[in-house]
């Protein structure tokens, strides 16, 4: 959520910055409503003062045994007008807040301006796309012999886009997750297995709604709706909603391992079959609460961890600075880490690392008190560390052998009984 004071102070500058993300944005309706709200507050405060003054005069008049009926009538008239003004103020302020919460975060100055992902800028490449002495197979073809994934049986129970891991696939997935969690812990992150269902206001706090209302799985619990999390970012941000940190306790680093649930997976094309785009997947999420001054260092820390993981897994990858048209609603800056998938003949995102400035903390009311006792909103950052489906695919497709077997990355072998190869099964 953006600071209305800044919009009020520099409306043209704010609108210019916001239009880099969405050219249709106009701040005029917000400015007009803000003006009405402030005038209504002024009028209401003026009437409250008049009412208090008249009440004192009535008390004094009655103490002198004089007639106060005219003043009493005026107080009643003012009370009625106050009731009307307060109802109108509530209505106008709700309309103002409804517009404010739909504004995205401002993009940083160094973010490329583009309406879509075609404007993303590759800022680093490590390794070259894998080459083979044989025609490489898609992970679905590899699975025909490996037998580590199943799409048919879960399709019966849940529909398309809900894969199941089985046998050695389960062990490889958990080896990957254990490795990722231990990596986060080694860098000072507190580990969490948080709830998977959250209240609506927690989704609001992280910026998922109202902008993207209807895109999340929801369950009804009596008179309350709970939502399946699309990312652990939601719940980690919500842990400290309406709380105040001491500056000396920042930064705080969290990492959570959760299933994530997303409805939009059904839009995948034929080339994105299998694990590339699904409704449910595991992800280790990094999250940080910082002061504004600590945010850049936290960002570099998250990015370096992602690079360390991809380097240890020996996967070809690149980093892309997302354009204004491809970055998220909440982010001021996002770098995607993308791995090469031979089966898709393309790079695919496995991690997004985002700075969100004070956008989420204003919505969640998460603040900190500095050494002078002054209150500030914290800055929040998040990053995938990492999402496993495409990482799983990358491991299979980049390490495949001609016979359909797969070489297990060295860093994962200790979690798999030092097994070196996933052998193909005839």
UniProtKB/Swiss-Prot annotation:
Protein biosynthesis among keywords: yes
Q: Which GO terms describe its cellular component?
A: cytoplasm
Q: Which NCBIfam families match?
A: serS
Q: What subcellular compartments does it reside in?
A: Cytoplasm
Q: Which UniProt keywords apply?
A: Aminoacyl-tRNA synthetase, ATP-binding, Cytoplasm, Ligase, Nucleotide-binding, Protein biosynthesis
**Where is ATP annotated to bind?**
262-264, 278, 349-352
EC number(s) on record?
6.1.1.11
Write down the chemical reaction(s) this protein catalyses: tRNA(Ser) + L-serine + ATP = L-seryl-tRNA(Ser) + AMP + diphosphate + H(+); tRNA(Sec) + L-serine + ATP = L-seryl-tRNA(Sec) + AMP + diphosphate + H(+)
* Entry binding sites for L-serine: 231-233, 285, 384
Q: Identify this protein by name.
A: Serine--tRNA ligase
Function, as annotated, reads: Catalyzes the attachment of serine to tRNA(Ser). Is also able to aminoacylate tRNA(Sec) with serine, to form the misacylated tRNA L-seryl-tRNA(Sec), which will be further converted into selenocysteinyl-tRNA(Sec).
Q: Name one GO biological process term.
A: seryl-tRNA aminoacylation
**Which top EC class is given?**
ligase
Q: Does the keyword Nuclease apply?
A: no
Task: Show the GO MF annotations.
Answer: ATP binding; serine-tRNA ligase activity
List, alphabetically, the PROSITE patterns matched.
Answer: AA_TRNA_LIGASE_II
Alphabetical list of Pfam families matching this protein: Seryl_tRNA_N (PF02403), tRNA-synt_2b (PF00587)
**UniProt subunit comment:** Homodimer. The tRNA molecule binds across the dimer.
Record note on domains: Consists of two distinct domains, a catalytic core and a N-terminal extension that is involved in tRNA binding.
Q: Which family does it belong to?
A: Belongs to the class-II aminoacyl-tRNA synthetase family. Type-1 seryl-tRNA synthetase subfamily.
Per the record, the pathway is: Aminoacyl-tRNA biosynthesis; selenocysteinyl-tRNA(Sec) biosynthesis; L-seryl-tRNA(Sec) from L-serine and tRNA(Sec): step 1/1
